[in-house]
UniProtKB/Swiss-Prot annotation:
One of its GO terms (molecular function) is holo-[acyl-carrier-protein] synthase activity. This is Holo-[acyl-carrier-protein] synthase. It comes from Salmonella typhimurium (strain LT2 / SGSC1412 / ATCC 700720). Homodimer. One of its GO terms (cellular component) is cytoplasm.
């Protein structure tokens, strides 16, 4: 097994809150998968939820070495929690195609948040 990519991102939660205040649900619609959207709609802290998902997806795009472009979209990366609560990634569409092309066998995700920031790191492994 070899490390194929590493990405980290930090998000200022107030920045996400400001975007939501200005443009409503548009950012959430662009960033979240259908499953994440269903959670976001009823979440007790939707801004924090969105900020954490955004951080993971930015970190994943950096780990892939592409950023969000060339057919990749935020909603092709889905963040979910396993039975122990650990954050995991599920891929769709072009993100899945790219992972298969690169030979990604494992994706490791870590996520942290404090009052003002959400931070995520993603490691891609063969």
């Amino acid at each position: 097994m070899a490390i194929l990519g590493l990405g980290t991102d930090i998000v200022e939660i107030a920045r996400i809150e400001a975007v939501i205040s200005r443009s409503g649900e548009r950012l959430a619609r662009r960033v979240l998968s259908d499953n994440e959207w269903a959670i976001w709609e009823t979440h007790q802290q939707p801004v924090r939820f969105l900020a954490k998902r955004f951080a993971v997806k930015e970190a994943a795009a950096k780990a892939f070495g592409t950023g969000i472009r060339n057919g990749l979209a935020f909603n092709q990366f889905e963040v979910f929690n396993d039975e122990l609560g650990k954050p995991r990634l599920r891929l769709w569409g072009e993100a899945l195609t790219l992972a298969e092309k690169l030979g990604v066998a494992h994706m490791h995700v870590t996520l942290a948040d404090e009052r003002h920031y959400a931070c995520a790191t993603v490691i891609l492994e063969s």
